[in-house]
Amino acid sequence: MNTEFPRIKRLPPYVFNITGELKMAARHRGEDIIDFSMGNPDGPTPQHIVDKMIESARKENTHGYSVSKGIWRLRKAMCNWYKRRYDVDLDPDKEAIVTIGSKEGLAHLMLACCDRGDTVLVPNPSYPIHIYGAIIAGADIRSVKMIPGVDFLQELERAIVETVPRPKMMILG
C-alpha cells in the first residue's frame, strides 16, 4: 500500500503554526505578547446575536442543509454590499456564492479551476491559503513580489509574460 501523500509533501510549513510556537515560547519566558496573527474574537458574542441564533435554531425549517450556492437572500445582500462599498454590480445567481469561510472558499475555487501543470500567480507576501489552495489543487505557484520599492504591476506583467504555459489564475487580496 502506498502511504505517500505528494500534495501534502509539497505544502510549505504553515506560518501560523510557526508563529504559534514562537508566541508560546515567548510567553513561557514571561514576555508579554500582543497577538496580531489571526482575527480570532477576543470577547463574547454579543447577546442579540446569540438570541437570534437560538431563535433560528428553534425553527423547524432551519434543520437541514442550505442550497449549494447559499441562501438567495444572503447572496443578494452580499451583492448589494459590494454595490454600496465598491460600486460593483454583481449577479447573485451567477457571481455570488456562500462558503463556510474564506479559506475553504479559496481552496475549493482552486480545486474547481486548477489542475496539475496549471500556474497560479500569488502575491508575496500573501495569506497562506493562497499558496496552499493552489498546491492542494496540484497547481504550481509563481510568486509576484509586493514589497516597498518594487513596482508590483511590472512584476505582475513579467510573471504573466515569462510563465509558460500562461497562468491559469491570479490571486488578488
PLM features: residue spans?
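Nucleotide-sugar donor-binding loop of glycosyltransferases
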Residues: 124-126, 145, 173
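N-terminal small-domain helix-loop-helix segment of the aminotransferase-like
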Residues: 2-5, 9-100, 108
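Conserved PLP-anchoring active-site segment centered on the Schiff-base-forming lysine
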Residues: 112-129, 133-134
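A short helix-loop-beta submotif of the ANL/AMP-binding
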Residues: 136-141
